[in-house]
């Protein structure tokens, strides 16, 4: 049984990471889906810096970025739960790369799967700064998906 950690931020690259993880996973494997809400978002109910899957009007109604992230991950669980033994969801706040690395240790992940780039401030693509940091500092293998 492998324990796989998949970092998900709603970007196309992270959606491809989920798809690739499923291709690599066996029926007896365990997948943890992780979304990291940058600290600035977790502490603010109104900001211009939005995750791509989070619509501001829904935040005002639901009250929190973390709740919306959990809802999004729960939808993904429904799509993949029949393919593996267990699917966990985690939503953390803080620095995305740091939280991915901490969660990998906490969950005893055998591999980290993430997209090669994600979303940054105001929807602009980062040039893989989170991915780069995870690859350089991870104590387990990292699968970077394009």
Task: Indicate where each model-derived feature is located.
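General small-molecule cofactor/ligand-binding pocket signal
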Residues: 32, 88-92, 143
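Short conserved AdoMet
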Residues: 25-27, 81, 139
């Amino acid at each position: 049984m492998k324990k796989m950690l998949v970092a998900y931020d709603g970007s196309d690259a992270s959606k491809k990471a989920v798809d690739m993880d499923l291709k690599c996973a066996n029926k007896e494997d365990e997948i943890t889906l992780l979304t990291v809400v940058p600290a600035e978002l977790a502490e603010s109910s109104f900001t211009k810096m939005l995750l791509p899957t989070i619509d501001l009007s829904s935040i005002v109604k639901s009250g929190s970025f973390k709740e919306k992230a959990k809802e999004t991950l729960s939808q993904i669980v429904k799509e993949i739960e029949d393919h593996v033994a267990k699917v966990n969801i985690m939503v953390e706040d803080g620095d995305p790369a740091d939280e991915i690395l901490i969660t990998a240790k906490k969950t005893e992940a055998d591999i980290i799967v993430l997209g090669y780039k994600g979303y940054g401030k105001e929807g602009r693509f980062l040039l893989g700064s989170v991915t780069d940091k995870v690859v350089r500092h991870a104590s387990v293998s990292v699968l970077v998906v394009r």
